């Protein structure tokens, strides 16, 4: 009984992590790539491999979407705010590109 309960808990957790995986439509990723190339690559690098002065987006935590949205919208440290330039849909597309675009 105990073994069955433990196996069930493991399977539930494994299913939750797969179910929680983010998947984005290819069009959204493509839009995010275009926005990234236009507004972000200068500082963050062509493939999210940053120069020494910017955060390495290739390793940005994929479970911190809210932090990403806030940083892009309002700026953080030396990064200017982009909320007046990139609309919420564009920021969502950037997130899709960050998560799924550079595999």
Regions found by a protein language model. Give the residues of each.
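Short cysteine clusters
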Residues: 40-43
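Electrostatic cytochrome c docking/interface patches
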Residues: 13-35, 103
């Amino acid at each position: 009984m105990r073994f069955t309960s433990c196996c069930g808990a493991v399977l539930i957790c494994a299913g939750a992590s797969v179910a929680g995986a983010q998947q984005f439509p290819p069009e959204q990723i493509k839009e995010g790539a275009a926005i990234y190339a236009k507004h972000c690559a200068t500082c963050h690098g062509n493939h999210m491999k940053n120069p020494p002065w910017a955060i390495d987006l290739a390793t940005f935590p994929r479970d911190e979407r809210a932090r990403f949205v806030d940083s892009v919208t309002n700026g953080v440290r030396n990064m200017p705010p982009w909320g007046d330039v990139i609309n919420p849909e564009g920021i969502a597309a950037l997130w899709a590109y960050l998560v799924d675009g550079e595999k």
